[in-house]
């Protein structure tokens, strides 16, 4: 199978002044550290502010996003984009499928129904080695890619709002 190549879109719409929410599941602390490092580096390089909210597992991420978005809106400090980070490693039961599919579905529903610029960095893997390969900034850097996706969606949202 050919390796997929992803090039960032060339939209130069400004994300200046943006405020990004990162919601991370700390079920695998060491892997999560790598995912978060990649996401934060990407956001810092774009010059945007970010806050981090931590939840126990991937299934809690969508609810935490809603809680945080609503609270920020009430304070008059809305978030412009969201990055979801977590790791789900396949085990011996159906739990992997439930967590993987339901967290992805809930994030998609949230993004579409609420118009949230969202990057999904919940990695779903069969082994710890696969998780590390996807989490490390020097390798596949899925945390950084999720932040980049959130910023790309924010740029599109801002550009379309001006059209």
UniProtKB/Swiss-Prot annotation:
<dbReference type="GO" id="GO:0009231">
    <property type="term" value="P:riboflavin biosynthetic process"/>
</dbReference>
<protein>
    <recommendedName>
        <fullName>6,7-dimethyl-8-ribityllumazine synthase</fullName>
        <ecNumber>2.5.1.78</ecNumber>
    </recommendedName>
</protein>
<feature type="binding site">
    <location>
        <position position="134"/>
    </location>
    <ligand>
        <name>(2S)-2-hydroxy-3-oxobutyl phosphate</name>
    </ligand>
</feature>
<keyword id="KW-0686">Riboflavin biosynthesis</keyword>
<dbReference type="InterPro" id="IPR034964">
    <property type="entry name" value="LS"/>
</dbReference>
<comment type="similarity">
    <text>Belongs to the DMRL synthase family.</text>
</comment>
<feature type="binding site">
    <location>
        <begin position="58"/>
        <end position="60"/>
    </location>
    <ligand>
        <name>5-amino-6-(D-ribitylamino)uracil</name>
    </ligand>
</feature>
<comment type="function">
    <text>Catalyzes the formation of 6,7-dimethyl-8-ribityllumazine by condensation of 5-amino-6-(D-ribitylamino)uracil with 3,4-dihydroxy-2-butanone 4-phosphate. This is the penultimate step in the biosynthesis of riboflavin.</text>
</comment>
<feature type="binding site">
    <location>
        <begin position="92"/>
        <end position="93"/>
    </location>
    <ligand>
        <name>(2S)-2-hydroxy-3-oxobutyl phosphate</name>
    </ligand>
</feature>
<dbReference type="GO" id="GO:0005829">
    <property type="term" value="C:cytosol"/>
</dbReference>
<dbReference type="InterPro" id="IPR036467">
    <property type="entry name" value="LS/RS_sf"/>
</dbReference>
<feature type="binding site">
    <location>
        <begin position="87"/>
        <end position="89"/>
    </location>
    <ligand>
        <name>5-amino-6-(D-ribitylamino)uracil</name>
    </ligand>
</feature>
<feature type="binding site">
    <location>
        <position position="27"/>
    </location>
    <ligand>
        <name>5-amino-6-(D-ribitylamino)uracil</name>
    </ligand>
</feature>
<feature type="binding site">
    <location>
        <position position="120"/>
    </location>
    <ligand>
        <name>5-amino-6-(D-ribitylamino)uracil</name>
    </ligand>
</feature>
<feature type="active site" description="Proton donor">
    <location>
        <position position="95"/>
    </location>
</feature>
<dbReference type="GO" id="GO:0009349">
    <property type="term" value="C:riboflavin synthase complex"/>
</dbReference>
<dbReference type="GO" id="GO:0000906">
    <property type="term" value="F:6,7-dimethyl-8-ribityllumazine synthase activity"/>
</dbReference>
<dbReference type="InterPro" id="IPR002180">
    <property type="entry name" value="LS/RS"/>
</dbReference>
<dbReference type="Pfam" id="PF00885">
    <property type="entry name" value="DMRL_synthase"/>
</dbReference>
<keyword id="KW-0808">Transferase</keyword>
<comment type="pathway">
    <text>Cofactor biosynthesis; riboflavin biosynthesis; riboflavin from 2-hydroxy-3-oxobutyl phosphate and 5-amino-6-(D-ribitylamino)uracil: step 1/2.</text>
</comment>
């Amino acid at each position: 199978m050919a390796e997929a190549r992803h090039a960032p879109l060339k939209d130069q719409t400004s994300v200046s002044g943006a405020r990004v929410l990162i919601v991370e599941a700390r079920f695998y602390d060491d892997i999560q550290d790598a995912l978060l490092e990649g996401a934060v580096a990407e956001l810092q390089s774009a010059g945007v502010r970010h806050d981090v909210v931590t939840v126990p597992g991937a299934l809690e991420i969508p609810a935490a996003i809603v809680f945080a978005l609503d609270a920020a809106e009430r304070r008059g400090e809305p978030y412009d984009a969201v990055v979801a980070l977590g790791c789900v490693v396949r085990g011996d039961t159906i739990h992997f499928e439930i967590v993987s599919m339901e967290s992805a579905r809930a994030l998609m529903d949230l993004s579409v129904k609420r118009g949230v610029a969202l990057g999904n960095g919940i990695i779903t893997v069969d082994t710890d080695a696969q998780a590390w390969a996807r989490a490390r900034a020097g390798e596949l850097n899925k945390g950084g890619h999720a932040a980049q996706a959130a910023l790309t969606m924010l740029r599109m949202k801002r550009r379309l709002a001006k059209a």
